[in-house]
Amino acid sequence: MVERAKILEAVTTAIEKAPKRKFSESIDITINLKNIDMAQPKNRIDETILLPNGTGEKTGICVIGRGDIVTQAKDAKVDLILGPDEVERLGGAPREARRVASSYKYFLAETAVMPQVGRFLGPRLGPRGRMPMPIPGQTDIRPIVERLRNSVKIRTKDKTVFSTKVGSTAMTPEQVSENIDAILKRVESVLEQGHLNVRSVFVKTTMGPSVRLV
């Protein structure tokens, strides 16, 4: 486990060393694992992690369904709403389907339309790890949407090096540090040897140099 003060020091240094911009930049961490065989599926990480302070940037969410779930999606101001007809149409429009799959981070789908989603969008969403979360009828999706807006998804596949967004330069270093702390604790909790499987951690802004944390 990394001490919070050390995380804060690395975040502050990364922000200070980054070229000054007139716009907000993302802040990311890159984690390099060791002594772990990622060819074994049981060792791979596939986690959605709620950040205590959000990402500081907009997270694209798509809701698929009809009726009440559509009404709730509109109330929650999600970025894209698709009905069954649109899903089927995208099945015959591969370029547009790829754009949808890459443009939105999270997908929610009414349980009743999941077979159509699997058939027509599965080939685009599956490889990206973005198959929709099934939503049973009468479920209030608004708290789910709010949670996802403040979450990041880590999916390593068979790689030992992976990166994730942890915040933005519009946030305070303390807020970003809290987010990093939450991510590292979650990652270490699913590794067989915990922090002993972590070779290094670097933090950087989009345009700035990397600063070693671990």
Curated annotation (Swiss-Prot):
One Pfam match: Ribosomal_L1
Q: Cite a single GO MF annotation.
A: structural constituent of ribosome
Lineage top rank: taxon: Archaea
Gene Ontology biological process terms in this record: regulation of translation; translation
Query: Is the keyword Cell wall biogenesis/degradation assigned to this protein?
Result: no
Record keywords: Repressor, Ribonucleoprotein, Ribosomal protein, RNA-binding, rRNA-binding, Translation regulation, tRNA-binding
Gene Ontology CC annotation, any one:
large ribosomal subunit
Secretion signal span? none
Q: Which InterPro entries match?
A: Ribosomal_uL1, Ribosomal_uL1-like, Ribosomal_uL1/biogenesis, Ribosomal_uL1_3-a/b-sand, Ribosomal_uL1_arc
Subunit text: Part of the 50S ribosomal subunit.
Entry similarity comment: Belongs to the universal ribosomal protein uL1 family.
NCBIfam families in alphabetical order: PRK04203.1 (NF003244)
Tell me the PANTHER family matching this sequence. 54S RIBOSOMAL PROTEIN L1, MITOCHONDRIAL, LARGE RIBOSOMAL SUBUNIT PROTEIN UL1M
Write out the function statement from the record. Answer: Binds directly to 23S rRNA. Probably involved in E site tRNA release.
- Specify the protein name: Large ribosomal subunit protein uL1
User: What is the scientific name of the source organism?
Assistant: Methanoregula boonei (strain DSM 21154 / JCM 14090 / 6A8)
| Gene field | rpl1
